Every structure is written in structure tokens, then in C-alpha cells.
From Swiss-Prot:
Name of the coding gene: Egln1
Residue span, Fe2OG dioxygenase domain: 271-369
Organism in which the protein naturally occurs: Mus musculus (Mouse)
Stretches for region Beta(2)beta(3) 'finger-like' loop: 218-228
Name the UniProt record assigns to this protein: Egl nine homolog 1
Keywords: Acetylation, Cytoplasm, Dioxygenase, Iron, Metal-binding, Nucleus, Oxidoreductase, Phosphoprotein, S-nitrosylation, Vitamin C, Zinc, Zinc-finger
Tissue: Expressed in heart, brain liver, skeletal muscle and kidney. Low levels were detected in the lung. Constitutively expressed during differentiation of C2C12 skeletal myocytes.
Length: 400
């Protein structure tokens, strides 16, 4: 791999973005395939599990990636003016989710690579070598100069309006242009304080009655899962006793997505997962950088609703940091109460949850692209094996 300058062993930011475990999407402490040197895995076990598929495309030398990056809009730098004021169609007010960036410097260039050569053809044990440290560098490594800030934030009440926008207007005039331009969209004050409080009460009741279990990985054959993700989760359909307001939240999300139908990239969204209700217990756990859908399992949009009143990230941490592909910038999203977040689920948006030092609740739903979902043969990334819930076209839309 080489940078645009052509120097040997120098990685561009976009090349670093494409380094993730081919099986689970993890982006830290990766091992490189010793044969093609263009695929990565978080452990030997995950490479073995993926070898049957990978060996069909694994070739010696610097083979290019099998699939190019999707030709979708990326997160763009903010327009001229005040730093951090990224707007979608001029409709949204600035969010309070500040983003920071650093520009990688020459010191981040990778050294000449070393490691085992290509494996003998037909080898049953796939070759693997440790990915050099500099190639695992963050998009925003220490030592670089400060860059432009990026704020994907926005509000449910753009331009200082005091009345919430109807769902159709919010979807078409804010969410669609914001997603297609930036790939990230934040809506504040989504359902209102009273409804948000009711959802929080239902989630805490689930937690208090022992409904949560440790977040699962694709493979549980090692003891390192808690080092990767420290949350506890439960899956909710929305019809369970005591989860009526969570069901209302899911219906409200569905309404927004339905209004966006056919306008979010090239996707044809026709279903979603159940809701994953997650809790970080506040003991300093987080979730390392990863990609929700690195292997085309059908998920195209990640939608997260936060439930944390009076959250102060300076004290409690818990920020969701998104590293948009190909950008020397990252977007920091604070998990604030009644905040709704959308972003593309594929490798355009690697992200991490930074350590949380107070109890942190969130509800996540993933929406499916019909065509990609139909092509997906292995359904293992969602934890519920891609449970599909139909979006009923005759659902009565609600203003939110």
C-alpha cells in the first residue's frame, strides 16, 4: 500500500479506513493476511472462519480490495464561516455535538513492512501476520496540527422554531439532505421530555429485572469479548408488556424512514431489526472502533436514540466518536437525552463508544436495504441474526 505521494509503505487515510476484521468489523490490533496482505482479522480464529470465502479472492502480492468503497456522499468539511457549522440545506441549527480533527503528519507514515511471505497454494491454515503499528493509526493521530471542525448536529426545531416539525417535513427537508451530504444526522428533542422519560422508565425496568445480557460478538470462542465491548443488551420487538413506549419510539423511527423512502442514497429500505436496548454500566467500559456492517449483511442505516438526562461528557465520557471514511476528521456525538442519530451502517462510518463513567442507555435499530439483504447469505452480525420486521406501507404517519 502506498500514499498518494507514491512513497513505499506510506498509507493514505482512506487506506487506513479500510482496515477492519473481515468477519466482525473490529478495527483495533489487527492481523494482516500474510498471503494477499490486503485483508485483516482481529484474531487467528476469525481468519480461519472466513478462510473458505477469503481464499477464493486471496492472491499473493499487493492485491486490491475486492470491492471498492460505495459511491455515496461522504461527510463534508463545514462551509466557510464559523468552525463546526455544518448545515444540511440550510435547514438545521448547529448541534452541540462538537467534532474535532487532526491532520496526520509525516511521522504517521508506515515503516517498510515485514512478515511471513505468501502461503503455499492449497494451504488449509490461512497465513496471518501482525499489522504494523503505524498502519493502525487513528484518522486523528496525536502530533498532527489542528484541522477544521465538523459538526453533523442539528435539531428537530430548525431556525429557532418553537413548534416541532411534522415527520414528513423533518424527513424530507432535513434528514434526507443531511444524510446524503454528510452521512450522519442528529435530531434533538425528538419525542419530547415526557415521552422520553417514559421510554427511560421502561428501559430501566428491563435492566432492574435482569433482562439484559452481555453484548455478544460474532465469535465467543475467546475470553476477550469484554475488552472489545462492555455493554449489556436486550432485544425488544415493541409489543412486550411494559415496552409500549419503546414500541412508540420504534414506530416513530419507522415513520421517518418511510418518509425518506427512495431518497436515502440508492437504498430501497423495506425492513429493520428489532430494537437493541443497550446499557453501559458506568464502570469505564466502552466499545472499540468497529464497523456495523463490513460484509454486506443488508444493514444500511443505523438509528440510535439516547436516554441520558443531564449527560456531561466531560465528566461521564460515553461519547460516540465516528471516523468518516477518507476524512481527517471525527464527529463526536454526546449521548444526550431525547437525541436521535442516523448514520450509514457500512464502512463509511467506523465508530467507537468511548469509556462511560455513568450509566449510559441507548436504543439502536438497523434498517435493511432490500437488495443487499436479499444477497446476504450469512446472517450473523446483528446478534439476532438479522431479525426482519416489515415496515407496513399503510401505517398512519405521526407528527413527532
Amino acid at each position: 500500500m502506498a500514499s498518494d505521494s507514491g512513497g513505499p509503505g506510506v498509507l493514505s487515510a482512506s487506506e487506513r479506513d479500510r482496515q477492519y476484521c473481515e468477519l466482525c468489523g473490529k478495527m483495533e490490533n489487527l492481523l494482516r493476511c500474510g498471503r494477499c496482505r490486503s485483508s485483516f482479522y482481529c484474531c487467528k480464529e476469525h481468519q480461519r472462519q472466513d478462510w473458505k470465502k477469503h481464499k477464493l479472492v486471496c492472491q499473493g502480492g499487493e492485491a486490491p480490495r475486492a470491492q471498492p468503497a460505495p459511491a455515496q456522499p461522504r461527510v463534508a468539511p463545514p462551509p466557510g464561516g464559523a468552525p463546526g457549522a455544518a448545515r444540511a440545506g440550510g435547514a438545521a441549527r448547529r448541534g452541540d455535538s462538537a467534532a474535532a480533527s487532526r491532520v496526520p503528519g509525516p511521522e504517521d507514515a508506515a515503516q517498510a513492512r515485514s512478515g511471513p511471505g505468501p502461503a503455499e497454494p492449497g494451504s488449509e491454515d490461512p497465513p496471518l501476520s501482525r499489522s504494523p503499528g503505524p498502519e493502525r493509526a487513528s484518522l486523528c493521530p496525536a502530533g498532527g496540527g489542528p484541522g477544521e471542525a465538523l459538526s453533523p448536529g442539528g435539531g428537530l426545531r430548525p431556525n429557532g422554531q418553537t413548534k416541532p416539525l411534522p415527520a414528513l417535513k423533518l424527513a424530507l427537508e432535513y434528514i434526507v439532505p443531511c444524510m446524503n451530504k454528510h452521512g450522519i444526522c442528529v435530531v434533538d428533542d425528538f419525542l419530547g421530555r415526557e415521552t422520553g422519560q417514559q421510554i427511560g422508565d421502561e428501559v430501566r425496568a428491563l435492566h432492574d429485572t435482569g433482562k439484559f445480557t452481555d453484548g455478544q460478538l460474532v465469535s465467543q470462542k475467546s475470553d476477550s469479548s469484554k475488552d472489545i465491548r462492555g455493554d449489556q443488551i436486550t432485544w425488544i420487538e415493541g409489543k412486550e408488556p411494559g415496552c409500549e413506549t419503546i414500541g412508540l419510539l420504534m414506530s416513530s423511527m419507522d415513520d421517518l424512514i418511510r418518509h425518506c423512502s427512495g431518497k436515502l442514497g440508492n437504498y430501497r429500505i423495506n425492513g429493520r431489526t428489532k430494537a437493541m436496548v443497550a446499557c453501559y454500566p458506568g464502570n469505564g467500559t466502552g466499545y472499540v472502533r468497529h464497523v456495523d456492517n463490513p460484509n454486506g449483511d443488508g444493514r444500511c442505516v443505523t438509528c440510535i436514540y439516547y436516554l441520558n438526562k443531564d449527560w456531561d461528557a466531560k465528566v461521564s465520557g460515553g461519547i460516540l466518536r465516528i471516523f468518516p471514511e477518507g476524512k481527517a476528521q471525527f464527529a463526536d456525538i454526546e449521548p444526550k437525552f431525547d437525541r436521535l442519530l442516523f448514520f450509514w451502517s457500512d464502512r463509511r462510518n467506523p465508530h467507537e463508544v468511548q469509556p462511560a463513567y455513568a450509566t449510559r442507555y441507548a436504543i439502536t435499530v438497523w434498517y435493511f436495504d432490500a437488495d443487499e439483504r436479499a444477497r446476504a447469505k450469512v446472517k450473523y452480525l446483528t446478534g439476532e441474526k438479522g431479525v426482519r420486521v416489515e415496515l407496513k406501507p399503510n401505517s398512519v404517519s405521526k407528527d413527532v
